[in-house]
Design a protein with these regions (language model features):
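Aromatic/acidic polysaccharide-binding cleft in carbohydrate-active enzymes
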Residues: 1-81
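Flexible loop/turn segments at secondary-structure boundaries
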Residues: 17, 23-29, 91-94, 117-120, ...
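Carbohydrate-binding surface patches
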Residues: 67-106, 110-117, 159-165
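Acidic, Ser/Thr/Pro-rich beta/coil linker or hinge segments at domain junctions
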Residues: 104-152
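Compositionally biased regions
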Residues: 142, 161, 182-183
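Short beta-strand-to-coil "C-cap" segments at the C-terminal boundary of structured domains/repeats
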Residues: 164-172
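Mature N-terminal, pre-catalytic/accessory segment of carbohydrate-active enzymes
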Residues: 173-185
Length: 185
């Protein structure tokens, strides 16, 4: 889902509508539970990952090498941060990535999208946290990666994604300071 949304953003598409239902049968991004809460599906986590990654202007990312079925997308934030979304669609192979940014230095924050299996319906996390039954989400964990001679090394496990933020903002901070969390609406 996130990869598709990035493809559309890179083509200049300004909005996307996804269809679903509020019952928990069939395929939907999230559904309303009978007890009044929400249950989100994998598709929703892809949209949430995109929301965290796509805060700014899409910029070109050049890829070299081969190996895992890995895609990458980059966004330059208004605050000067560079957000690099790495999506490993390979079901078996981890991807070792070296992001070359000779003009940047210092620490980068990494937030990961993980699931126990590619078709998981539960235990999916972004930033070490799942979306709560009330629809709120607040990341619990990020990693730090230091540049080594202008290169940020990162490993992206099979069937997972990582958001690397170099610069002013940590991944998982609200897009709008008045909005303390991200939740389905």
């Amino acid at each position: 889902c996130a990869d598709y949304l990035f493809d559309l953003a890179e083509l200049g598409v300004a909005g996307v509508n996804f269809h679903g239902s509020f019952n928990c049968r069939g395929y939907t991004s999230f559904c309303a539970l009978k007890n009044g809460g929400y249950h989100v599906h994998g598709h929703y986590y892809g949209m949430l990952f995109f929301r965290q990654a796509a805060r700014g202007r899409v910029v070109t990312l050049t890829r070299s090498g081969d190996g895992a079925n890995l895609t990458g997308h980059a966004v330059l934030g208004d605050d000067g941060s560079l957000r690099v979304a790495l999506i490993n669609k390979d079901l078996e192979s981890d991807a070792k990535v070296a992001i070359h940014l000779p003009e940047r230095s210092g620490q980068a924050s990494v937030m990961r999208l993980r699931a126990p299996a590619i078709d998981a319906k539960n235990d999916i996390t972004l930033g070490g946290a799942g979306v709560a039954a009330d629809g709120t989400w607040k990341p619990k964990s990020t990693e730090s990666i230091a540049a080594q001679d202008g290169i940020y090394p990162i490993e992206v496990p099979a069937a997972s994604a990582a958001l690397l933020v170099i610069g002013a903002e940590r991944p998982g901070t609200p897009a709008d300071p008045a909005e303390p969390s991200s939740r389905p609406r």
